[in-house]
Curated annotation (Swiss-Prot):
This is Phosphoprotein. It comes from Bovine parainfluenza 3 virus. Keywords: Coiled coil, Phosphoprotein, Viral RNA replication. It holds the Pfam family Paramyxo_P. GO terms for molecular function: RNA binding; RNA-directed RNA polymerase activity.
């Protein structure tokens, strides 16, 4: 701060002496000492600064031929206070081809400068120089055909003194103030990076300001603002300072920017540049900061406006400037068309990729059967999907697909619920069928058991057979007979005279003929004879058939039943295991014999 104050004192003494036609030796020595100290500070700042990419505002100003002329009047609303250092009087210059290369000024910390920082611009001609300013931490680059001079004044008290003495020169409004912002730093458009003017073929000496000049300046500064948005990517190379120089035929988009002044002091402080002071403020991020990257100083005599065409701030292009006149709108429209075509091409490619992914998704969800074109389907749902994917933008497509997926999932949930209900109904039907089948099996088992019992009873009844006298061809006899009333047979008392009557029934067995003896009499007799011959030991061994059984067999054989019936009774008798079974069997035998 002390160095800045000292420098300001030297400049004030320099300006006070400039009014006189002659300058003493002391003032000249002060100027030389100031220049030497400035160069040493520049070398020190350059040695301390490595790979920072900062650009500094020059404090050394060179000037060429000058001619006395009136102050140029511009048709713009922004105002800069122009100052020429190192000369006896102030001069303003105008370039020959009216085109100035774009110059970039960036602060060391790119933060906002204090409210006391201020830009004073003087324009010279035919200088190509790049020199740093250690006090302000900025650097300016100038080409041979495009010249501009800037100075930073940080002392508020001395700035007020300068404002009372200096003449504010009207500077054309900017043709391009792109909203550049890097690393979250911004200066609200108060840092000026380049100024361009037209060349009138001569340089003019700035005369003293009058009240009429100030009133005219106020009237011009009260014009309405006009803003025109520009894309941020056009000035990326300018912000970074490493971009390649582009073709000068490409015109950068224009942002008309005018400062609306409030009072004479406000009008004199027309433009402030953000620089790094002793205490640099912290960079502020957001949408506030908009760096001024291109300025054009216009001549009042020519009604046309030009644009700055340089895209590289570190490598100034010399001798290749392009004036824009009536063909400006054509170039702007061409650039806009190119950008629009590029964006449309990107949007089209993105939309195509999105549509392909959407078709695959729809195929996986089951909305469509194959990945063919959606236009081939006649289903209303698919037609609706095709219309949305072909016409809507990406956001609408995303919303539509989200809704479609939700609808498909809900549809699937409904189908799942229906399937679950059908499965439950099938389960209940199967349970009913199982119950009926079980009942049927039980009934069949009962019927089978009943049939088997009936068959067993039938077998027992059929084994009895029929009467002997009954003819065989007469047919089947009933198994169950009902007892009818039978005539009672009177018992005849035995009379010995009955034997003489010749009735065989009345003849006793002992007197019967040998021919009518039973067949098994021989067997019986043989058994008796064998038993007599056996020893006493053999008699003690139990025999297979007892005497009772033998006698019963003899009785059955002597009956009047058929041979088949006799054999069946004998077989049943052999199977009997108890006396009760034998008695029951003999009762049945007696019934059969009595029934005949």
């Amino acid at each position: 701060m002390e160095n800045n104050a000292k420098d300001n004192q030297i400049m004030d003494s320099w300006e006070e002496g400039s009014g006189d036609k002659s300058s003493d030796i002391s003032s000249a020595l002060d100027i030389i000492e100031f220049i030497l100290s400035t160069d040493s500070q520049e070398n020190t700042a350059d040695s301390n600064e490595v790979n920072t990419g900062n650009k500094r505002l020059s404090t050394t100003i060179y000037q060429l031929e000058s001619k006395t002329t009136e102050t140029s009047k511009e048709n713009s609303g922004s105002v800069n206070e122009n100052r020429q250092l190192g000369a006896s009087h102030e001069r303003a210059t105008e370039t020959k081809n009216r085109n100035v290369n774009q110059e970039t000024i960036q602060g060391g910390n790119r933060g906002r400068s204090s409210s006391d920082s201020r830009a004073e611009i003087m324009v010279t001609r035919g200088i190509s120089r790049s020199s740093p300013d250690p006090n302000n931490g900025t650097q300016i680059q100038e080409s041979i055909d495009y010249n501009e001079v800037g100075e930073m004044d940080k002392d508020s008290a001395k700035r007020e003194m300068r404002q009372s003495k200096d003449v504010p020169v009207k500077v054309s409004r900017s043709d391009a103030i792109p909203p550049t912002k890097q690393d979250g730093n911004g200066d609200d458009g108060r840092s000026m990076e380049s100024i361009s003017t037209f060349d009138s073929g001569y340089t003019s000496i700035v005369t003293a300001a009058t009240l009429d000049d100030e009133e005219e300046l106020l009237m011009k500064n009260t014009r309405p603002k006009r803003y025109q948005s520009t894309p941020q990517e056009d000035d990326k190379g300018i912000k970074k300072g490493v971009g390649k120089p582009e073709d000068t035929n490409k015109q950068s988009p224009i942002l008309d920017y005018e400062l609306n002044s409030k009072g004479s002091k406000r009008n004199q402080k027309t433009l402030k540049i953000s620089t790094t002071t002793g205490e640099s403020t912290r960079p502020q991020s957001g949408s506030q900061g908009k760096r001024i990257t291109s300025w054009n100083i216009l001549n009042s005599e020519s009604g046309s406006r030009t644009e700055s065409t340089s895209q590289n701030s570190q490598i100034p292009t010399s001798g290749k400037s392009n004036t824009v006149g009536p063909g400006r709108t054509t170039l702007e429209s061409r650039i806009k068309t190119q950008k629009t075509d590029g964006k449309e091409r990107e949007d089209t490619e993105e939309s195509t990729r999105f549509t392909e992914r959407a078709i695959t998704l729809l195929q996986n969800l089951g909305v469509i059967q194959s990945a063919a074109k959606l236009d081939l389907y006649q289903d209303k749902r698919v037609v609706c999907v095709a219309n949305v994917l072909n016409n809507a933008d990406t956001a609408s497509k995303i919303d539509f697909l989200a809704g479609l997926m939700i609808g498909v999932s809900m549809d699937h949930d409904t189908k799942l619920n229906q399937i679950q209900n059908e499965i439950l109904s099938l389960k209940t039907d199967l349970k009913k069928m199982d119950e009926s089948h079980r009942r049927l099996i039980e009934n069949q088992k009962e019927q089978l058991s009943l049939i088997t019992s009936l068959i067993s009873n039938l077998k027992i009844m059929t084994e009895r057979g029929g009467k002997k006298d009954q003819p065989e061809n007469s047919g089947r006899t009933p198994m169950i007979k009902t007892k009818a009333k039978e005539e009672k047979i009177k018992k005849v008392r035995f009379d010995p005279l009955m034997e003489t009557q010749g009735i065989e029934k009345n003849i006793p067995d002992l007197y019967r003929s040998i021919e009518k003896t039973p067949e098994n009499d021989i067997q019986i007799k043989s058994d008796i004879n064998r038993s007599n011959d056996e020893s006493n030991a053999t008699r003690l061994v139990p025999k297979r058939t007892s005497n009772t059984m033998r006698s019963l067999i003899i009785i059955i054989n002597n009956s009047n039943l058929s041979s088949r019936a006799k054999q069946s009774y004998i077989n049943e008798l052999k199977l009997c295991k108890s006396d009760e079974e034998v008695s029951e069997l003999m009762d049945m035998f007696n019934e059969d014999v009595s029934s005949q």
